[in-house]
Swiss-Prot record:
Binds 1 siroheme per subunit. Binds 1 [4Fe-4S] cluster per subunit. [4Fe-4S] cluster binds at residues 434, 440, 479, 483. It catalyses: hydrogen sulfide + 3 NADP(+) + 3 H2O = sulfite + 3 NADPH + 4 H(+). It comes from Shigella dysenteriae serotype 1 (strain Sd197). Siroheme binds at residue 483. Pathway: Sulfur metabolism; hydrogen sulfide biosynthesis; hydrogen sulfide from sulfite (NADPH route): step 1/1. GO terms for molecular function: 4 iron, 4 sulfur cluster binding; heme binding; metal ion binding; NADP binding; sulfite reductase (ferredoxin) activity; sulfite reductase (NADPH) activity. This is Sulfite reductase [NADPH] hemoprotein beta-component. Keywords: 4Fe-4S, Amino-acid biosynthesis, Cysteine biosynthesis, Heme, Iron, Iron-sulfur, Metal-binding, NADP, Oxidoreductase. Its cofactor is siroheme; [4Fe-4S] cluster. Alpha(8)-beta(8). The alpha component is a flavoprotein, the beta component is a hemoprotein. Belongs to the nitrite and sulfite reductase 4Fe-4S domain family.
Length: 570
């Protein structure tokens, strides 16, 4: 093979069954509408189980009672997860009140789950409530289109309330990119909103009739914050500002964290720098990256289909040149940018427009009324009186944005009375887990239900070694698909089996290095024993300001991952 093309541009071979399903779906319609009327089962059937994902839903069941129901010869208790499309995480208080009501009245679990992709999910929607949820979202100007499956998913944007002008500009671009890359099929409107079938033929000028080979994730990032974890994403626009005003973006392509246990052809990968582009080329470049991946991505193997694998197969320079050709531009050299952190600043922060922003820590993003901590009711009360908006962060927290000085005390009173401002340790603020059991069908080990007590134990270790005012970026994900973004943490736990995890070390605080597996298939006591020893060493031996992940690399405890496509599994 020549240097120019390390591998073929298009992978030949038998297409996956998902490709057949998309082709035969009549632009994502399938027989979803007919399935909705089938009262004999609580779930969708056949291809529709996968097709509903394009409409923002996953079919799930309660795994806590799966075996019990099987013994009783009952089908699993099917219910849908629905994920809203919410570019940049901004939601109005009117929209919040509508979703609060729906969650309370029409879902099994009664909760709103904030996700690390800056949106919210409902868990436990019975089939009879599926159409009503889409109609409720539509009535307040929201939808769930393209938040799952082989499309451009929810577009993230740094939650930067301090520089309001820059955030407003970046947020507008996140919305524009999201709209530009949406599917054009009318299937969503016909099925869920009862809109008339139009005589014209469906066309998908950007995504194509069989859509993308695999999921595709996009971010807009405002340095020095990397709160959206750009290296977990396929396409990233890093905001470059002059005098506080947005002038263009650095483009980074080909990040992604999902792996498969034991499959060395899979790897987490940091995104590659392509170059700088002025603002006016943003949509053309976004489209060019997506269509290049559409045409070159591997449709014969879904485990090798993401943009990161395409880049490694054809070479970064070849992919970049094709994007330039399709967009009709030449990238300029990357402009300087630097990341200093990725956590949220919990509490009140004053923006440059003299408004205040209150960032509330929501453990694991789960909003529910707990005994003595009515979080859900408290947020509803704030939504009723707050004139600004709410912003969901990529750390699963919530910002009450744009609070005038005169309203501060009123909002703080509700937040405190509801347990929304309870003091937590820096360690808890910088820890995160995906949903996992009982609803996720892919879960191998607990994550969300495991994290709170696990962090209690970590807090005890931090106190024992005199570093309780410090933090380690710590994440738990229930399976190697990696929704909890453990593969960008300083300490990442990846679920292997019930009660067992792979322990990864050596990421860094700012999320620019992939961690390496340190110990495999170990239990919580074994994890804590390892971390006890390592935290003690870090506390005693670290250099000034040295994070835990950087220390583990410098001290030779773990080798850094330099080229994950080739050395992640070594």
């Amino acid at each position: 093979m020549s240097e120019k093309h390390p591998g073929p541009l298009v992978v030949e071979g038998k297409l996956t069954d998902a490709e057949r399903m998309k082709l035969e779906s009549n632009y994502l319609r399938g027989t979803i509408a007919e399935d909705l009327n089938d009262g004999l089962t609580g779930g969708f059937k056949g291809d529709n189980v996968l097709l509903i994902r394009f409409h923002g839903m996953y079919q799930q069941d309660d795994r806590d009672i799966r075996a019990e129901r099987a013994e009783q010869k009952l089908e699993p208790r099917h219910a849908m997860l629905l994920r809203c499309r919410l570019p940049g995480g901004v939601i109005t208080t009117k929209q919040w009140q509508a979703i609060d009501k729906f969650a309370g009245e029409n879902t099994i679990y009664g909760s709103i789950r904030l996700t690390n992709r800056q949106t919210f999910q409902f868990h436990g929607i019975l089939k009879k409530n599926v159409k009503p949820v889409h109609q409720m979202l539509h009535s307040v100007g929201l939808d769930a289109l393209a938040t799952a499956n082989d499309m451009n998913r929810n577009v993230l944007c740094t939650s930067n309330p301090y520089e309001s002008q820059l955030h407003a500009e970046a947020y507008e671009w996140a919305k524009k990119i999201s709209e530009h890359l949406l599917p054009r099929t009318r299937a969503y409107a016909e099925i869920w909103l009862d809109q008339e079938k139009v005589a014209t033929t469906d066309e998908e000028p950007i995504l194509g009739q069989t859509y993308l080979p695999r999921k595709f994730k996009t971010t807009v990032v405002i340095p020095p914050q990397n709160d959206i974890d750009l290296h977990a994403n396929d396409m990233n626009f890093v905001a470059i500002a002059e005098n506080g005003k947005l002038v263009g973006f650095n483009l980074l392509v080909g990040g992604g964290l999902s792996i498969e246990h034991g499959n060395k052809k899979t790897y987490a990968r940091a995104a590659s720098e392509f170059g700088y582009l002025p603002l006016e080329h943003t949509l053309a470049v976004a489209e060019a990256v997506v269509t290049t991946q559409r045409d070159w991505g591997n449709r014969t193997d879904r485990k090798n289909a993401k943009t990161k694998y395409t880049l490694e197969r054809v070479g970064v320079e070849t992919f970049k040149a094709e994007v330039e050709r399709r967009a009709g531009i030449k990238f300029e050299p990357i402009r300087p940018y630097e990341f200093t952190g990725r956590g949220d600043r919990i509490g009140w922060v004053k923006g440059i427009d003299d408004n205040w922003h209150l960032t509330l820590f929501i453990e694991n993003g789960r909003i529910l009324d707990y005994p003595g901590r009515p979080l859900k009711t408290g947020l509803l009360e704030i939504a009723k009186i707050h004139k600004g908006d709410f912003r969901i962060t990529a750390n699963q927290n919530l910002i009450i944005a744009g609070v005038p000085e005169s309203e501060k005390a009123k909002i703080e009173k509700i937040a405190k009375e509801s347990g929304l401002m309870n003091a937590v340790t820096p360690q808890r603020e910088n820890s995160m887990a995906c949903v996992s059991f009982p609803t996720c069908p892919l879960a191998m080990a607990e994550a969300e239900r495991f994290l709170p007590s696990f962090i209690d134990n970590i807090d005890n270790l931090m106190a024992k070694h005199g570093v309780s005012d410090e933090h380690i970026v710590m994440r738990v994900t229930g399976c190697p698909n990696g929704c909890g973004r453990a593969m960008l943490a300083e300490v990442g736990l990846v679920g292997k089996a019930p009660g067992r995890y792979n322990l990864h070390l050596g990421g860094n605080r700012i999320g620019t290095r992939i961690p390496r597996m340190y110990k495999e298939n170990i239990t919580e006591p074994e994890i804590l024993a390892s971390l006890d020893e390592l935290i003690e060493r870090w506390a005693k031996e670290r250099e000034a300001g040295e994070g835990f992940g950087d220390f583990t690399v410098r001290a030779g405890i773990i080798r850094p991952v330099l080229d994950p496509a080739r050395d992640l599994w070594d």
